[in-house]
Amino acid sequence: MLDSKLLRTELDETAAKLARRGFKLDVETIRTLEEQRKSIQVEVENLQSTRNSISKQIGQLMASGDKAGAEAVKQQIGTLGDDLDAKKVELDAVMAQLDAITQTVPNIPDDAVPNGKDDSENVEVSRWGTPKTYDFEVKDHVDLGEMGDGLDFASATKITGARFVVMKGQFARLHRAIAQFMLDLHTDQHGYTELYVPYLVNAETLFGTGQLPKFGQDLFHTEPLTEKASDEEPRRLSLIPTAEVPVTNLVRDTILDEAELPLKMTAHTPCFRSEAGSYGRDTRGLIRMHQFDKVELVQITRPEDSMAALEELTGHAEKVLQLLELPYRKVILCTGDMGFGSCKTYDLEVWVPAQKTYREISSCSNMWDFQARRMQARFRRKGEKKPELVHTLNGSGLAVGRTMVAILENYQEADGRIAIPAVLQKYMGGLTHIG
């Protein structure tokens, strides 16, 4: 979340920055609540001061033998205490309203982020590789998978419903090989520590990375979600939409030593998304699933290092595509297409021959101190006493299913077989083709 000081001292400037991303900050409500907060805070402080001052009289009156006077002062203190408690309740109510607003306010875009309404106004930064030309009719990954008896959408629909898949044989092996290759690359060459994390998380964790309270409808929940459960009730949990959620929350309520930074972590997990706002979009194939695998990259850095870390992390995701020899382009998201907690995001879009277009395969974001403030994730500089908020970054390195789509379509041959990229062949037992 944003620093509350910005909403107190730079309200109009903050509203203008948020307007760049199409978010209308309720300035008047915040200003009214802030005035109420200040007024009640003054009353609370005055009541506390008065009570403390009067309390000193009790000892003096008792010492002089004036028990009646001392008793009268005690009654006065009791009345002041009741008034003080009532004002504190008022103050808590106003603060709760301010917190509720703050929790739904997105991050401020970095100055380098281009203005725009939606993904049509994202700006291309670079391209790598040249899309192949084919002397036969290109098939999409669904047809290729069904021809090779490797992608079974009908059985998945019977078992669960739409937007799921059963993978079989060498197609399932290819899916596994892709994830193994990515993990080996990121751990062996890019310096990430591999993690195995829970796939179910609690509400506090989802709040920390920004999914709650605003985006609960995008998740799958084990039970109706509540902020806390009593000891007698089962814990309400949610399936993770991305490994970013559990991995980033490892530093929640933690003060790190400066020497520990940067932290670089990676995890391969399934991801679960309801796709609540995607009805009718990408209904065919693996592009948009309720359950899909992803290798996630997370970095925790000092504030002054985070923008350089974004370039590094994005480069690590790009390296996967380059080694797989898949054509892609890199775009910087405009203000209207950025995620809720991001201050700057690059998308990597891979070439999908059957669609004759580039499709997102990775999104790499600098969250600045937005998540860290929600999580109270901090570090202490050498020689300093006061801790500071860390910066958090995350990115897909890559989405496994979409990488498989790109391989199936870009490496297809005229007879319907799929050539295996050279870097994956050792993970496939030396196979050069499937299908």
Curated annotation (Swiss-Prot):
- Could you tell me the superkingdom of the organism this chain comes from? Bacteria
Q: Binding positions for ATP?
A: R273, S274, E275, E360, I361, S362, S363
EC numbers for this chain? 6.1.1.11
Ranked from the top, the taxonomy reads: Bacteria, Pseudomonadati, Pseudomonadota, Gammaproteobacteria, Vibrionales
Query: Single GO cellular component annotation?
Result: cytoplasm
| Alphabetized NCBIfam families for the sequence | serS
Family annotation (PROSITE patterns): AA_TRNA_LIGASE_II
Q: What does this protein do?
A: Catalyzes the attachment of serine to tRNA(Ser). Is also able to aminoacylate tRNA(Sec) with serine, to form the misacylated tRNA L-seryl-tRNA(Sec), which will be further converted into selenocysteinyl-tRNA(Sec).
Task: State whether it acts alone or in a complex, and with which partners, per the record.
Answer: Homodimer. The tRNA molecule binds across the dimer.
Supply the SUPFAM superfamilies for this chain.
Class II aaRS and biotin synthetases (SSF55681), tRNA-binding arm (SSF46589)
Instruction: Kindly provide the name given to this protein in its UniProt entry.
Output: Serine--tRNA ligase
Pfam families for this protein: Seryl_tRNA_N, tRNA-synt_2b
Q: In which pathway does it act?
A: Aminoacyl-tRNA biosynthesis; selenocysteinyl-tRNA(Sec) biosynthesis; L-seryl-tRNA(Sec) from L-serine and tRNA(Sec): step 1/1
| CDD domains for the chain | SerRS_core
